[in-house]
Amino acid sequence: MSSIQKTPVVTCFLTRNDSGELHILIARRSERVGSYNARWAGVSGFVEAGVSPDEQAFTEIREETGLQRDQVRMLRRGAVVEYEDASLGRHWFIHPYLFETLAPDAIQHDWEATEMRWIAPAELSNFETVPKLAEAYESAVNGEKT
């Protein structure tokens, strides 16, 4: 019997306001990432040992979008969303965040994504996403203000 590995990750929802309408950034995961290839996700990554989820969130944003800390603002920190994927042998602990993007035109995706799109949050259900992405978004939106 295989053991299930507890795996903390961050998922960051970057937002921008387009003429009064809120949009969130989603990224299509490349074939080069370790799981859920070609699925849509927020900006996400493993929480490294000795690093807080808050710090990891800023690191993932910088690595995956090129945005620096002064180009985003953390708005909310959601409650952890859990998901067990026996096929991967992982029990995910998803730390969701909501960020305001101060420089959306500066975003450049890295190798982890094949494309990125700004969508209305209501459109999320139209995409094949990583597990629990909608729940993570709801948690982030309803999370504590930072």
Regions found by a protein language model. Give the residues of each.
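Conserved Nudix-box catalytic region and its N-terminal flanking loop in Nudix hydrolases
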Residues: E21-E63
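Active-site-adjacent beta-strand/loop module that shapes the phosphate/pyrophosphate-binding cleft
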Residues: T7, R16, A79-A106, A140
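Conserved N-terminal beta-strand and adjoining loop/helix that marks the start
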Residues: M1-L25, L98
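Short loop segments at secondary-structure junctions
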Residues: R16-G20, S30, E100-D105, A120-E123
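Nudix hydrolase/Nudix homology domain
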Residues: N37-A38, R90, I94-P96, A106-T146
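A short coil-to-beta-strand element that immediately follows conserved catalytic motifs
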Residues: Q68-G78
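A generic fold-level signal
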Residues: I4-T7, S19, S35, G89-W92, ...
